[in-house]
């Protein structure tokens, strides 16, 4: 076996089950989806790697489209703007990348772009972090969620 870049404490934290209290759910296309919020993923990275032990870098952001649309029940004029992003996570010598998408909807075109970019970057960051293990949501990909502990809130 080779040497590891992580301390025994970090390996234990990365191998531990995901705490169900940190998991959120939402309904999408008639299904219930479990996920970690972006701030929770950042908090876990800070806890496991240290506040100064990891870096997040946006490698690319791209606007996919820009469409005028109506907003809400009032049918106000607005914009729908999807973006994609690629983010790189670096913990010392370990580098992971993730891709994500975001969709901004707002009456103001600039606000729609800002919202889409933030959502795409957060999605990409979470996808990069998930490759480190359960504390970042990897356990949620198992339909039985065998590596998710606790009863939730």
Model-flagged regions — what are they?
Residues 4-9, 36, 41-152:
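Positively charged, aromatic-enriched nucleic acid-contacting surfaces
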């Amino acid at each position: 076996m080779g040497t590891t870049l992580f301390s025994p404490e970090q390996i234990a934290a990365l191998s531990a089950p995901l705490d169900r209290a940190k998991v959120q759910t939402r309904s999408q296309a008639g299904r219930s989806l479990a996920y970690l919020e972006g701030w929770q993923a950042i908090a876990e990275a800070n806890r496991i790697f240290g506040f100064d032990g990891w870096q997040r870098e946006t490698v690319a952001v791209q606007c996919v489209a820009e469409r005028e649309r109506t907003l809400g029940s009032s049918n106000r004029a607005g914009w729908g703007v999807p973006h994609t992003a690629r983010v790189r996570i670096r913990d010392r010598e370990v580098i992971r990348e993730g891709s994500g998408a975001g969709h901004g909807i707002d009456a103001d075109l600039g606000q729609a772009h800002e919202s889409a970019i933030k959502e795409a970057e957060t999605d990409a960051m979470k996808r990069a972090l998930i490759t480190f293990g359960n504390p970042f949501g990897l356990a949620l990909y198992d339909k039985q969620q065998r590596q998710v502990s606790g009863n939730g809130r």
